[in-house]
Amino acid sequence: MGKYFGTDGVRGEANLELTPELAFKLGRFGGYVLSQHETEAPKVFVGRDTRISGEMLESALVAGLLSVGIHVYKLGVLATPAVAYLVETEGASAGVMISASHNPALDNGIKFFGGDGFKLDDEKEAEIEALLDAEEDTLPRPSAEGLGILVDYPEGLRKYEGYLVSTGTPLDGMKVALDTANGAASTSARQIFADLGAQLTVIGETPDGLNINLNVGSTHPEALQEVVKESGSAIGLAFDGDSDRLIAVDENGDIVDGDKIMYIIGKYLSEKGQLAQNTIVTTVMSNLGFHKALNREGINKAVTAVGDRYVVEEMRKSGYNLGGEQSGHVILMDYNTTGDGQLSAVQLTKIMKETGKSLSELAAEVTIYPQKLVNIRVENVMKEKAMEVPAIKAIIEKMEEEMAGNGRILVRPSGTEPLLRVMAEAPTTEEVDYYVDTITDVVRAEIGID
């Protein structure tokens, strides 16, 4: 991570940390870095979610892009993965999404995609940061015909919707409940599933600029659980603010998280011989039950650090086509370059239709172990050295010996906060409490500050 760019672009409280002035500079400098080798007039797609600050930041960002001669195609409100898809398929120099994903409405973010549809690598972000910190802006200042042209491009959303529909199968009146989080999916999810023939009940579809992710969406699926049961839906599909995540709800109102979604899709692809190297890429936070289910099916796994960017890096490096996170990021590389909640939803309903199985039947093949996560406040300098403290090492080893392979412990520093995270999984909640409490007592005694 750099000074401005975190693990998923530039984020902060809108108008205080992520200001219009910074958005202008990101447009100007980011656009220049990503298009400086173009032989023709560069084209950049810009999308946003429904936050009240979105249009303010979009106006500033677009002005910055236009100021270095870039033609800007405004996509309006649509999903983050739609920007990635359009960049890759329509030959743009880059794409920019204005969103803070699952964060509350007061936050916003700016995320860049390169011409290949992938998020920027560290080197490109470093180039942009160097220009942001330079004492003087020495970039070209074209005038007249050298300036960029602004084009409204609402048809981009229709193309994305049509593409997702083309990857699915007719649902023939299947009852589907949608929760679009009052966010980006509110402009597309209803249309996609209506075109597939589903009978719909939709919540979280009335954005007002302030209610994105507010008690709705993938981070708050409780309302959808009730709607699924009340409407008799076969499945509920909850997206986050920018629709790069999916959390599902089965016909009984039970949560089906990212681990289970990956397993269902992975097994389906494996049985068809379409799972690249018969491997799923996941992170260290995936549940032990998920790993055991993969082992039972003979499906391999590659494990990365937490964060969808690390999952994508491993997929690109090794040629895998399915990966994701427990939180609901699922990357289907055969279809798109980034996590796509609506794409995952289309594939999940397709599998239900083709197999004739309910979502609860498909998900029951993964027995999720009880999991507990505790965050302990520590000094930043100590969070990296925690595993070198003898008493902490000893208690972790002791707990792992007691587990005898039927559980898992993960102690890791937070990437963004002065926290040490202690997580355990075991067959019962009582065992999980025992393992986590025992370890956290030692950690607090040795290095904790709370």
Curated annotation (Swiss-Prot):
GO annotation terms (biological process): carbohydrate metabolic process; peptidoglycan biosynthetic process; UDP-N-acetylglucosamine biosynthetic process
One GO cellular component term noted in the UniProt record for this chain: cytosol
Modification note: Activated by phosphorylation.
Disulfide bridge positions per record: none
Signal peptide span: none
Organism: Streptococcus pneumoniae (strain 70585)
Modified residues (Phosphoserine): S101
A Pfam family matched in the record: PGM_PMM_IV
InterPro entries for the chain: A-D-PHexomutase_a/b/a-I, A-D-PHexomutase_a/b/a-I/II/III, A-D-PHexomutase_a/b/a-II, A-D-PHexomutase_a/b/a-III, A-D-PHexomutase_C, A-D-PHexomutase_C_sf, A-D-PHexomutase_CS, Alpha-D-phosphohexomutase_SF
Catalytic site: S101
Protein's UniProt name: Phosphoglucosamine mutase
Reaction it catalyzes: alpha-D-glucosamine 1-phosphate = D-glucosamine 6-phosphate
Cofactor(s) recorded in Swiss-Prot or TrEMBL: Mg(2+)
Cofactor comment text: Binds 1 Mg(2+) ion per subunit.
Listed transmembrane segments: none
Family statement: Belongs to the phosphohexose mutase family.
Lineage: Bacteria, Bacillati, Bacillota, Bacilli, Lactobacillales
UniProt: Mg(2+) binding residues: S101, D240, D242, D244
Keywords: Isomerase, Magnesium, Metal-binding, Phosphoprotein
Function: Catalyzes the conversion of glucosamine-6-phosphate to glucosamine-1-phosphate.
